From Swiss-Prot:
<dbReference type="GO" id="GO:0019547">
    <property type="term" value="P:arginine catabolic process to ornithine"/>
</dbReference>
<feature type="binding site">
    <location>
        <position position="142"/>
    </location>
    <ligand>
        <name>Mn(2+) 2</name>
    </ligand>
</feature>
<feature type="binding site">
    <location>
        <position position="198"/>
    </location>
    <ligand>
        <name>substrate</name>
    </ligand>
</feature>
<feature type="binding site">
    <location>
        <begin position="144"/>
        <end position="148"/>
    </location>
    <ligand>
        <name>substrate</name>
    </ligand>
</feature>
<dbReference type="GO" id="GO:0010121">
    <property type="term" value="P:arginine catabolic process to proline via ornithine"/>
</dbReference>
<feature type="binding site">
    <location>
        <position position="142"/>
    </location>
    <ligand>
        <name>Mn(2+) 1</name>
    </ligand>
</feature>
<feature type="binding site">
    <location>
        <position position="292"/>
    </location>
    <ligand>
        <name>substrate</name>
    </ligand>
</feature>
<feature type="binding site">
    <location>
        <position position="119"/>
    </location>
    <ligand>
        <name>Mn(2+) 1</name>
    </ligand>
</feature>
<keyword id="KW-0056">Arginine metabolism</keyword>
<keyword id="KW-0464">Manganese</keyword>
<dbReference type="GO" id="GO:0005737">
    <property type="term" value="C:cytoplasm"/>
</dbReference>
<feature type="binding site">
    <location>
        <position position="146"/>
    </location>
    <ligand>
        <name>Mn(2+) 1</name>
    </ligand>
</feature>
<dbReference type="GO" id="GO:0030145">
    <property type="term" value="F:manganese ion binding"/>
</dbReference>
<feature type="binding site">
    <location>
        <position position="144"/>
    </location>
    <ligand>
        <name>Mn(2+) 2</name>
    </ligand>
</feature>
<dbReference type="GO" id="GO:0004053">
    <property type="term" value="F:arginase activity"/>
</dbReference>
<comment type="similarity">
    <text>Belongs to the arginase family.</text>
</comment>
<dbReference type="GO" id="GO:0000050">
    <property type="term" value="P:urea cycle"/>
</dbReference>
Amino acid sequence: MSPHKIPEVHRHIMSSRYMEGNAVSIINMPFSGGQPKDGAELAPEMIEAAGLPEDLERLGYSVNVVQNPKFKSRPLKEGPNQALMKNPLYVSNVTRQVRNIVQQELEKQRIAVNIGGDHSLAIGTVEGVQAVYDDACVLWIDAHADINTPDSSPSKNLHGCPLSFSLGYAEPLPEEFAWTRRVIEERRLAFIGLRDLDPMERAFLRERSITAYTMHDVDKYGIARVVEMALEHINPGRRRPIHLSFDVDACDPIVAPATGTRVPGGLTFREAMYICESVAETGSLVAVDVMEVNPLLGNKEEAKTTVDLARSIVRTCLGQTLL
């Protein structure tokens, strides 16, 4: 059996504190403009074709698939800050659409399952969630902090910058992103899985006292204790909605081989699933992002392994259990 194949076991819907029904919207986000490698835009269609909607229906959910949105095409002329960051107008146009779509689906009392695509899309997903749940906390699972500003980013790729917009660190805002705003405070954000940070990201995490658990912490304390500490910090008493943003590169390359910025020494499959199980147990999940699957960065088997991992992440945070 594939390590990610859905087993013939008991399944049940996550008991939600915030949603009236048992409905989810899978929002496909075929976009790779926040980084230089082609392929991430193919992931949503592949994950859907592999059976994600059917997975969630078997769990008991009413599933709506927001078919690939008609994202605005790459502009013929980029914005005035092209020298400061790559594809700023293109990324801005798409993430603004993403914000609106996520907000609309949440307002329909549907859990937003956001399938990317690269992680620059979180500029929009975080704003969309906060527009409906302005006290939501964000659990960011990633090898990277994605907290660079356009000024501090060594690569100038915007998939490494989404949280700088959400936290207000990118101010004064580039003209292309004048629509964004600070929507979360540091006390409502926690990282798990970090192991590759740029110098300015280290400074932000230390100086702003942002809760961040590296792979050293996972090794030292174990994943159960790390998740418990992270949730207690950002969601004391479990009174806040949770937005889980999961970059598959948080996992070890053996677990997630088809992704763009692989870093050795990541989460095991079970550690990744434990995070998702813990989120499901809170009953507080309102949105989940699964980002940076890139089927072109690996052979057929590696692409399938990573696509199946994405399905497992979604199923598990929405309540799949063994018993």
